[in-house]
């Protein structure tokens, strides 16, 4: 299959709104509002693998930086209307960890109750919180499963399964 390298802004694949200034001005950061699921599905049906960079636009010509996990989650949610989708978040760790200093302390499965408890205990913090929030939003939108893992372990079935 061919690889189609694009950003969310290309071909109007994704439209975002500039994040409003509240306590913090995030600058040119976009929150995804719309995904062209039919176009993404059409590319896949043509044997094209879309690779999306985390840049979107606001329909007024402004490019916006968008969280990469959000781009992946929004694309997965849109594609779940056309396909059975597994969303895989790949990053430098082997999965969600009980101890951020112990790479072997991978939590094999995590549900919403455990997630909330780990956040309250300070075990899950920082960037892992929005990653898991994106995972649960994807599941709620029909994504079959979400796996958080290291890219090197993607085909080994390792990591954390989110449900």
Regions found by a protein language model. Name each.
Residues 1, 5-163:
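C-terminal catalytic "cap/lid" subdomain
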């Amino acid at each position: 299959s061919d690889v189609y390298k694009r950003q969310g802004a290309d071909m109007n694949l994704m439209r975002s709104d500039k994040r409003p200034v509240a306590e913090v001005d995030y600058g040119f950061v976009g929150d995804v509002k719309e995904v062209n699921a039919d176009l993404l599905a059409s590319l896949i049906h043509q044997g094209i693998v879309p690779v999306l960079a985390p840049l979107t636009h606001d329909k007024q010509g402004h490019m916006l930086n968008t969280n990469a996990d959000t781009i992946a989650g929004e694309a997965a949610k849109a594609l779940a209307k056309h396909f059975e989708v597994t969303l895989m978040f790949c990053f430098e760790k082997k999965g969600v960890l009980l101890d951020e200093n112990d790479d072997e302390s991978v939590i094999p499965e995590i549900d919403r109750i455990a997630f909330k408890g780990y956040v309250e205990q300070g075990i899950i913090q920082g960037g892992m919180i929005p990653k898991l929030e994106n995972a649960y939003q994807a599941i709620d939108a029909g994504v079959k499963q979400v796996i958080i893992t290291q890219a090197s372990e993607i085909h080994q079935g390792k990591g954390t399964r989110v449900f």
